Amino acid sequence: MSSIVLAVGNGKTLFGGAGVAPDADLVRFVDPESPIINAFDLCALRGDGIFEATTVWKGFPVSLENHLKRLANSARLVDMPEPNIPALTRAVQLVIDQYDDPEPGPMLRIIVSRGLDPDTGVGKAADRTPTVYIFLDAKGTLHSLEPITMASMTRGYPSDITARAPWLLNGARR
């Protein structure tokens, strides 16, 4: 148990699988100080992937269902496999269960890479399984509880730009 918990998810189970697999098949816990990213992974080569983040307040992931729906939408928009929401929900809970820091509001992040680059020899030998990282961190920058001031601004392009220029991926982070 720790104040920083890092798990590598089973991409085959968490993306494209059906139902919830046994806990041992969902995530593998690793030392957060150890290097774990494969140099041939598209997240390292091109930043190719999707992510979500939320606060876990006193053991409860805030709006997790909405964050996982948005993760699914992001996956669809970039032609990645569909996430297995029940399995991801369980995997998140397994990570939370390993957390034991007194900080009540650590940051939870789910990072999903497209997997190994198929244009490399290593990637050609592997299947196109997403790489999934889930971590909880009480030692990083946490959400402020202070009130904020917001302003509404234009993004500098028309609201219908997505229909005319879908390659912009406008709305991937709704």
Where are these regions (language model features)?
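Helix-start/capping segments and mature chain N-termini
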Residues: M1-P86, R90-L94, S113, G121-R174
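Ordered, amphipathic secondary-structure segments that act as subunit-interaction surfaces
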Residues: V92, D97, D101-V112
